[in-house]
């Protein structure tokens, strides 16, 4: 009996304590508060237009998503020192005061996504959140990332910035995020990746940059990403990518480069060579230009396919499936630099020969003379980088100083052979005369006429020899 009485007393004490706690820590009217598994204040989809007052200070989790809250005032959660999870996604947030999250030193997850009217976040909003490891800012209509926005977030591992209106990636934006492993930037309007955009991201494992407007990536942009395993760059405006960009990615396993207007000419050779050695999983890299290689996978081309320049200076026709402007196209490298030749020997398309140009005055065999109104043709003037029979040899074959490329003859034109002593018939001589008559003027003409004259006098010489030996009849 004593044991039963003792057990009943304990149960009664527990009920009384629970009731006292409820009175001491009231729950906001539109919310539900409970203690297991953690002290939680849950107010989702209640039509709230402001952050409710009276949230229990002991709350470890606060769920305010799916309401119509438009403003988060300063110190809204300052009394909730034990807060680790705060969900404010899917509201109508247009303004968050700089000190809205002051005092939340234990906060680990902050979800502000799906607030399309937010646009701008004060650079000091997240200062002091030293334990934050997940931050959702996706679909917030963000136009820019202010300087120092992520300063001090040393514990951050997941950063969601996709589906915003970001139009730039400022240098050093993520410099303090040394523990970041996942960075989502897809679905924005980012036009380029500067040199220090990802500086300090030594732990990054996944970088999603697809569905942007990226047309240029600085050669050193991925320098700190030695641990990166997944890189998505598909559906951008990339026409070429220096192989130097990918060199630091020693751990890369998954690469997607499809849906870009790739130009598969000599400037794609470094990327092609890198892809041949890459042992991870990669998407196709469909060529957009030149037209003869359209829709073919760069990885499956031969090195000999990547010759010449597919895009020359001057007016351009639009590149299919791309959004490149004429200004962006004009910024592309005009042609490939020779490996060993003097840079002065490189002619840009349409540029006349100059005094310092090794090609000055050279007319390759078979070209028409300058007098007919057409000058020498160069390899870069040929359509889509092809080399027609009337074009000059590749510039890489030129020696410094303008000497002839290896393999070209250095002597004058070869003379046509005359009639041999064994075949001195008139038919052979006529053939020889016809062949010599088709040649040009000058030395070539004279050299072809002498054998023909010798053949025509051969019968007369034979008659004189017979007359001398046999005597007159």
Swiss-Prot record:
Q: Report if keyword Phosphoprotein is assigned.
A: no
Sites of GPI-anchor amidated serine lipidation: 447
Domain of life the protein comes from: Eukaryota
Regions of biased composition (Gly residues) lie at 434-445
InterPro entries this protein is in? Leu-rich_rpt, Leu-rich_rpt_typical-subtyp, LRR_dom_sf, LRR_TM_domain-containing
Q: Which residue intervals define the domain LRRNT in the entry?
A: 27-57
Tissues expressing the protein: Detected in embryonic hippocampus neurons. Detected in brain (at protein level). Detected in neurons in the neocortex, in hippocampus, dorsal thalamus, cerebellum granule cell layer and the mitral cell layer in the olfactory bulb. Detected in brain, dorsal root ganglion and heart.
Q: Name one GO molecular function term.
A: heparin binding
Q: Annotated region Disordered: where? A: 346-446
- SS bond list: 27-33, 31-43, 264-287, 266-335, 309-336
- Please give, as recorded in its UniProt entry, the membrane topology of this protein: Lipid-anchor; GPI-anchor
Q: Which residues are glycosylated?
A: 82, 179, 372
Residue ranges annotated as compositionally biased, kind Basic residues, are 413-429
Q: Which SUPFAM superfamilies match?
A: L domain-like
State the Pfam families in the record.
LRR_8 (PF13855)
Reproduce the UniProt comment on modification after translation.
Answer: N-glycosylated. O-glycosylated. Contains terminal sialic acid groups on its glycan chains.
Q: Which residues form the propeptide?
A: 448-473
Signal peptide boundaries: 1-26
User: Major place of localization?
Assistant: membrane
Function of the protein: Receptor for RTN4, OMG and MAG. Functions as a receptor for the sialylated gangliosides GT1b and GM1. Besides, functions as a receptor for chondroitin sulfate proteoglycans. Can also bind heparin. Intracellular signaling cascades are triggered via the coreceptor NGFR. Signaling mediates activation of Rho and downstream reorganization of the actin cytoskeleton. Mediates axonal growth inhibition. Mediates axonal growth inhibition and plays a role in regulating axon regeneration and neuronal plasticity in the adult central nervous system. Plays a role in postnatal brain development.
Complex and partners: Homodimer. Interacts with MAG. Interacts with RTN4. Interacts with NGFR. Interacts with LINGO1. Interacts with KIAA0319L. Interacts with OLFM1; this inhibits interaction with LINGO1 and NGFR. Interacts with OMG.
The name this protein goes by in its record: Reticulon-4 receptor
